[in-house]
C-alpha cells in the first residue's frame, strides 16, 4: 500500500508540523477469509470510571468527544486493531501528530484518516501490514470476539468484541518496504525487514510503558513473519522517541555518501534518522548491508 499523510483530504503536508508526542513518524493497510467465534475465559473484573474532559461552552473538538467515555484499568493489552477500533485509532493518530486543530478541521482530519485506513490500499503479494493497538480496560482473557482471524477490512481485523476497552496507543508494522533503500541496480524491493510507523500514545497515557509494549509486539510479529530485522524512521528533534528506540536496542544507520534513501513524506524541514534492530540474532550481517 502506498502511504499518504492523510489519505484523501487536500491538506498540504508542508503546513503541518511534526509533533514531538508522536514516536517517530506516520504513514497507512490491507488483507482477507473463515468465520469463527472466540470465547476467552473471564478471570478478573474491572471498573469503569468516568473522567470526562472539561468541555468549554460551544462546540467541542473530536478529542473531547472521544475522552467523554474512557474505560480506565491498570491492565494494558496490545493486540491487532479491529474494525471497532477504527475511530479511536484515527483519533489517537491525529491528536498525537496534529494537535492544536480545532473544530471543524480536527474532525475533517480524523474522518479523512479513518477513510484511508478502512478503505486501505493494495499491498504487494507476499507482504504483510498490521495496525497494533494498546488497549486499556480489557483483558485478553475477558474478551469475547466474533469474526475471522484472517479477514481484514483495510487496516483492521473484521472482528467485533463485546468488551473492547479503550485505545491508548497505536503502531503500524509492515513488510512492504516502501521506506527502505532499494536493492541492486534494478532497485528491487527489500525483503525480510519489517518497518514500523505511526507510533503514537494518547497524552493521558504517556510515560506508562505503552510505546515499549507496542514495539515489543511489533518485534514479535516481525519474527513470526520470518523477518531478520526491524527498522523505522525517527525525527531527529524528537529526543524522547530517539531515546526510547535506542533503549530498545535500535541503532542509527548511516546513509552512504551520495545515496538517496526514501523518507517519510512530512513537512520539508523535518529531518529523520533511520534506525534498525536485529530480531533474528542468527543473522549478524543484517545491519551491515546498509552501510
Curated annotation (Swiss-Prot):
Acetyl-CoA binds at residues 199-201, 207-212, 238-240, 245. The lineage of its organism: Eukaryota, Viridiplantae, Streptophyta, Embryophyta, Tracheophyta. Residues 1-61 form a transit peptide. Autoacetylated at K-217, K-254 and K-265. GO terms for cellular component: chloroplast. GO terms for biological process: N-terminal protein amino acid acetylation; peptidyl-lysine acetylation. The active site is at 245 (proton donor). It comes from the Eukaryota. The keyword Cell membrane does not apply. Residues 76-280 form the N-acetyltransferase domain. It is an enzyme of class 2 (transferase). One of its GO terms (molecular function) is N-acetyltransferase activity. The keyword Iron does not apply. Expressed in green tissues. Coiled coil: none annotated. This is GCN5-related N-acetyltransferase 4, chloroplastic. It is found in: Plastid, Chloroplast. It comes from Arabidopsis thaliana.
Amino acid at each position: 500500500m502506498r502511504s499518504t499523510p492523510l489519505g484523501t483530504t487536500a491538506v498540504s503536508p508542508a503546513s503541518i508540523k511534526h509533533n514531538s508526542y508522536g514516536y517517530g513518524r506516520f504513514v497507512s493497510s490491507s488483507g482477507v477469509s473463515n468465520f469463527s467465534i472466540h470465547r476467552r475465559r473471564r478471570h478478573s473484573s474491572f471498573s469503569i470510571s468516568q473522567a470526562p474532559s472539561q468541555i468549554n461552552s460551544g462546540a467541542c473538538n473530536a478529542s473531547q468527544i472521544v475522552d467523554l467515555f474512557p474505560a480506565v484499568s491498570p491492565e494494558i493489552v496490545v493486540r491487532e486493531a479491529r474494525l471497532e477500533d477504527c475511530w479511536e485509532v484515527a483519533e489517537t493518530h491525529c491528536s498525537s501528530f496534529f494537535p492544536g486543530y480545532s473544530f471543524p478541521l480536527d474532525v475533517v482530519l480524523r474522518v479523512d484518516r479513518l477513510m484511508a485506513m478502512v478503505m486501505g490500499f493494495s499491498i504487494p503479494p507476499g507482504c504483510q501490514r498490521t495496525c497494533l493497538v494498546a488497549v486499556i480496560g480489557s483483558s485478553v482473557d475477558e474478551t469475547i470476539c466474533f469474526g475471522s482471524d484472517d479477514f481484514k477490512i483495510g487496516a483492521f481485523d473484521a472482528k467485533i468484541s463485546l468488551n473492547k476497552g479503550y485505545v491508548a496507543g497505536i503502531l503500524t508494522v509492515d513488510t512492504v518496504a516502501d521506506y527502505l533503500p532499494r536493492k541492486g541496480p534494478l532497485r528491487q524491493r527489500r525483503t525480510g525487514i519489517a518497518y514500523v510507523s505511526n507510533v503514537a500514545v494518547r497524552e493521558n497515557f504517556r510515560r506508562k510503558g505503552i510505546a515499549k509494549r507496542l514495539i515489543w509486539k511489533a518485534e514479535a510479529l516481525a519474527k513470526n513473519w520470518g523477518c531478520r530485522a526491524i527498522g523505522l524512521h525517527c525525527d531527529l528533534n524528537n529526543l524522547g522517541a530517539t531515546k526510547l528506540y535506542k533503549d530498545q536496542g535500535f541503532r542509527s544507520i548511516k546513509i552512504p555518501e551520495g545515496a538517496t534513501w526514501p523518507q517519510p513524506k512530512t513537512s520539508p524541514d523535518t529531518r529523520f534518522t533511520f534506525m534498525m534492530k536485529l530480531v533474528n540474532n542468527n543473522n549478524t550481517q543484517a545491519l551491515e548491508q546498509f552501510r
